[in-house]
Amino acid sequence: MLIILTGLPGVGKSTFSKNLAKILSKNNIDVIVLGSDLIRESFPVWKEKYEEFIKKSTYRLIDSALKNYWVIVDDTNYYNSMRRDLINIAKKYNKNYAIIYLKASLDVLIRRNIERGEKIPNEVIKKMYEKFDEPGKKYKWDEPFLIIDTTKDIDFNEIAKKLIEKSKEIPKFYVLEENKNKNNNISDKIDKETRKIVSEYIKSKKLDKDKIKEVVELRKEFLKKIKKMEEVDADRVLKEFKDLLNSY
């Protein structure tokens, strides 16, 4: 069984996944929690060039573990394309999957982020909130099995019971919509990578709120310009954005 968590930073995914795993384990379920942070935090420092390796390694771990165990994916998975890639792994082994959508208001996410020492710049969380692909809004296969408000009490025993029942069903897979336009994939990559570049830049420069807003706006205008281009080379564009930021 593949359990795909989706939700923004500060919503409580890691706490949720650990608590759920404990309850499932008490029900004699062999379960493992996996996510990109497991690998990302193994690097002593973060560099943008590591991200492709981190993504591929995370997927390989999930792919390998799903053969024998239940897997809880502890990641934001905020684009439906990310959730689709994970569902394809479940499909590969004919395993059931369940998307669990963890929700909280933007105010709560920001407050929690501040309480943990602003691990991620608040402006980045706000942008992710705006860009978030809400599960089930566009595709049938993307509909959440459960929607959880993490500001309320959570009954993990009841959630575990529902997941165990679902795991006994015959897996059903809808036709997954693929990105027909290559530029959509490139745009997703550029959007994600420039977000990371900005996040790292803000952290390294220790910018104040006004400067953060300026940098976020700079990225926004840069992406508008890129969207007007017919042919886009992602690597060249990312280098151009880094140069722009460094000269700012």
From Swiss-Prot:
In the record, biological process GO terms are:
conversion of seryl-tRNAsec to selenocys-tRNAsec; tRNA wobble uridine modification
Database matches in InterPro entries: KTI12/PSTK, L-seryl-tRNA_Sec_kinase_arc, P-loop_NTPase, Ser-tRNA(Sec)_kinase
Residue positions binding ATP: 7-14
EC numbers, comma separated: 2.7.1.164
| Enzyme class name | transferase
PANTHER family xrefs: L-SERYL-TRNA(SEC) KINASE
Q: What's this protein's family per the entry?
A: Belongs to the L-seryl-tRNA(Sec) kinase family.
Q: What is this protein called?
A: L-seryl-tRNA(Sec) kinase
